[in-house]
């Protein structure tokens, strides 16, 4: 009998331990070790996210959302351990005439762990915040209006100069709505900005510009070109264009079309261009060829002065056959080994009838096979953005359109998603970026006011009507005594004691009947 009791006791101890371990495993943050993408995590509603990583490995995410009467910029941060801050709206722009505008926020983190951000309503705004305090809305600098516009990007060069590009409509007789790409810079940490310079110089519109500052501090800008540019899209046909500045933004090269044959008819178009730099200092661009649904890439070994002939990225196709989007885009980032990671919505085979969010890696000479970050049936992933933290941790954000409302954003159930993965490049030692606590309210003291004299209390006898004798005093039911906790404890243990007593009684009865 003693052996049986021991086994029962061991089981009673083991079950809680196993159950507790299972719950602890469920509570752990999603892991991205050993080359596995973490399970996509929803950050909230609505669309067009961006991501940047500071020197501690903390990932910062912004996205466009809104509520009744306001269009907002949402912000959340993830620690290297996988803990997320509570999403907050760091900016809220009043809606005009009840019309909603996508705020389209962007992020850039500089070497001093300062976050630089742009967003829009009908104008472009710039702001910044310390990476350790961005989770507190009041730590964001009051926004500064740059000018009317739609798309924007900001970056900081090694000399501390801020560089900002944005699109703004330039009306001409031949094009009433043609958004050009403008460039401004700031030498005083964003307090003031230069006069805008039109760097597109095309008689057409522009959309989705991207800005890269290479290791030699040259500026590179790519964008999608066509008629229009308002509300984030162009009319067909479209092509992709590049310009560069080799003197810190003082002057710019003439626009260069990556494929001159594209953009003249709907039978040959290009969209969704992105640009990166590999570990050898060579530039690489990737763009989407329509309608053949091919992803092309081109490289430059002389800082963009000349480019290779376009070649297809192997083993990956676009999603034109599934969803003819004008608002999507591609994204690139480079890890500590110098490999360029391209993220896009695509397919791996022509027969594939569902979209996937894919990552393909350029090692300086060839592309890796695509790996799947997320796959969908009916829903459509869109607008991915990637950042690399600590040299080898990939952070990817995107949003998803629900199948029922692909082209109806007002009724859509669109959500922003996040996934991460660690790759086999060298890890960079993190630098501490401590969280800045929220400011404490201050007590304002008027030093000019003389202190008031402390009054001397007067004790007076007060007549009491119908006094109650001490023995007749009735205690309120809300007054507690020292014995209350004991009573509560006994009440809590009563069911367990009853069960234990019943078990012992049953055991004794069965033992007595066995010996009878």
Show the residue positions of the predicted features.
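N-terminal secretory signal peptides that target proteins for export/translocation
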Residues: 1-5
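Bacterial N-terminal signal peptides
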Residues: 9-25
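Cytoplasmic C-terminal tails of single-pass
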Residues: 512-516
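Extracellular, repeat-based ectodomains that mediate carbohydrate processing or recognition
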Residues: 30-506
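Alpha-helical transmembrane segments of integral membrane proteins
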Residues: 7-11, 490-491
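Generic detector of short alpha-helix boundary/capping microenvironments
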Residues: 8-9, 20, 374, 483
